[in-house]
From Swiss-Prot:
Protein name: Adenylosuccinate synthetase, chloroplastic
The gene coding this protein: PURA
Origin species: Populus trichocarpa
GO MF annotation terms: adenylosuccinate synthase activity; GTP binding; magnesium ion binding
Cofactor note: Binds 1 Mg(2+) ion per subunit.
Residues binding GTP: 78-84, 106-108, 371, 397-399, 480-482
Needed cofactors: Mg(2+)
More about this protein: This protein may be expected to contain an N-terminal transit peptide but none has been predicted.
Upper classification of the organism: Eukaryota, Viridiplantae, Streptophyta, Embryophyta, Tracheophyta
Subcellular location as annotated: Plastid, Chloroplast
Length: 491
């Protein structure tokens, strides 16, 4: 079936219809008529706001104007394309740092020759040979996975020697944490969270109940066996199917003796290093993993990750002061996707969702699982912008929408009885029963992947970008129009 001939219908639990929209959305009169129920009414090109003129600078000045400590954070449920922007920005920064999460954060980047790299722990700045990469204290580190990434990079000509620093305060994620992840999911049965089963939650659980093992513990092999024994014994007492005995402990200790020797050149007091670097005026770029809608506090709990992938996680995950953090860039897809379970108000079910999924190649970097897909949710995006205080946005995968004759944006929520919902709710019962009001915009039905100037985009594509800016109140400075490293428009 041709994409252009199909009108994608969102989840039937949420309705499209003309309705009163609360004033807090800041909609001007020329757009109110476009909140429709399965309608083909389209706004005229003349109603598009000319936001572009306010943000037209060349790419170099745009990047160089970023603050000394800047960050790139996910603005949806992950998989927005953060790694590509970090890779591009890294050329202008001395240090790229990860502050939270673990190998559940899959970032796909491409080098100048178009070779693909899928990274999970190593910061995306590694492809820039002049950049130092820091894995901060807030990250949980699976050493076999880290070494595998390093070996893969080295095998492809990317030098890692002296370029990766691992915090001595970071917690170690063991293979048995991954096993526990699967056991917990099996226990939860139908109410499972949809974890990547990379052991992230169990490792953070060990950290919080204070029986976790940190990188610095590898320097003390006289006490390491006792700490590991206590941790394994705790797991065995919790799960009957987890088999643990002296032989397993002996094997793990010997294994980690080898790991400790290999990791030693990378181990650093990164809190001291980061603050010294700030004092020396080094430029630092923080690479967030996952996204704010998966934040342990602000996401759709309990369908969230176990760390803080929002602005606050930068300070706690690196040990730097809030006052030194400057520009934060939110990365958001031109539509929305989500892996695993949890509420998804603008989800498109059935064949329509499949078409968007295959057009955008929406399959998880870490798990390979197909992602759920839907229209852009402006209510959720505004919520995320408020929490993080973004100075700008990077709109990615705009090219994926090129085949659609019309594009929808979820602009407000209401309860079943029509009562407006003024903000993104924390109550999942309410969130799962919401109706979404959509605004319909015209598609551009042309290939935009080779365009490099904003002014050269089709008017309908510009209108879509500018409408998002108007709705969320944050400028879009970067627009992704393909997976390649150069497929980026600076606005």
């Amino acid at each position: 079936m041709n994409l252009s001939s199909l009108r994608l219908e969102s989840n039937p639990r949420w309705s499209y219809h003309a309705a009163h929209f609360p004033a807090h959305h800041g909609l001007n009169p020329s757009f109110r008529r476009n909140f429709v129920s399965c309608s083909s009414i389209k706004p005229s090109a003349s109603s598009s706001l000319s936001v572009a003129e306010s943000f037209t600078r060349d790419s170099a000045s745009r990047i160089e104007s970023l603050s000394q400590v800047s960050g790139v954070l996910g603005s949806q449920w992950g998989d927005e394309g953060k790694g590509k922007l970090v890779d591009i920005l890294a050329e202008h920064f001395d240090i790229v740092a990860r502050c939270q999460g673990g190998a559940n954060a899959g970032h796909t980047i491409y080098n100048s020759e178009g070779k693909k790299f899928a990274l999970h722990l190593v910061p995306s700045g590694i492809l820039n040979e002049d950049t130092l990469c820091v894995i901060g204290n807030g990250v949980v580190v699976h050493l076999p996975g880290l070494f595998k990434e390093i070996d893969g990079l080295e095998a492809n000509g990317v030098s890692c020697t002296g370029r990766i620093l691992v915090s001595d305060r970071a917690h170690l994620l063991f293979d048995f944490h991954q096993e526990v992840d699967g056991l917990r999911e099996a226990e939860l049965a139908k109410s499972f969270i949809g974890t990547t089963r990379r052991g992230i939650g169990p490792c953070y659980s060990s950290k919080v109940i204070r029986n976790g093992i940190r990188v610095c513990d590898l320097r003390h092999m006289d006490t390491f066996p006792q700490k590991l024994d206590a941790l394994l014994s705790d797991v065995a007492s919790r799960f009957e199917s987890f088999k643990y005995g002296p032989e397993m402990l002996k094997e793990e200790v010997e294994r980690y003796k080898r790991f400790a020797e290999r990791l030693e050149p990378f181990i650093t007091d990164t809190v001291h290093f980061m603050n010294e670097s700030i004092a020396k005026k080094k430029k630092i770029l923080v690479e967030g993993g996952q996204a704010t809608m998966l934040d342990i506090d602000f996401g759709t709990y309990p369908f969230v990750t176990s760390s803080s992938p929002s602005a606050g996680g930068i300070c706690t995950g690196l040990g730097i002061a809030p006052r030194v953090v400057g520009d934060l860039i939110g990365v958001v897809k031109a539509y929305t996707s989500r892996v695993g379970s949890g509420p998804f108000p603008t989800e498109i079910l059935g064949q329509g969702g499949d078409l968007l999924r295959f057009a955008g190649q929406e399959f998880g970097t870490t798990t390979g699982r197909p992602r759920r897909c839907g229209w852009l949710d402006v209510v959720a995006l505004k919520y995320v912008c408020q929490i993080n205080g973004f100075s700008s946005l990077n709109l990615t995968k705009l090219d994926v929408l090129s085949e659609f004759s019309e594009i929808q944006i979820g602009v407000s929520y209401k309860q079943i009885d029509g009562t407006p919902v003024e903000s993104f709710p924390g109550d999942l019962c309410l969130l799962e029963q919401l109706k979404v009001d959509y605004e319909v915009l015209p598609g551009w039905k042309s290939d935009i992947s080779s365009i490099r100037k904003y002014a050269d985009l089709p008017k309908a594509a510009q209108q879509y970008v500018e409408r998002i800016e108007e709705l969320v109140g944050v400028p879009i400075h970067y627009i992704g129009i393909g997976p390649g490293r150069d497929a980026l428009i600076y606005k």
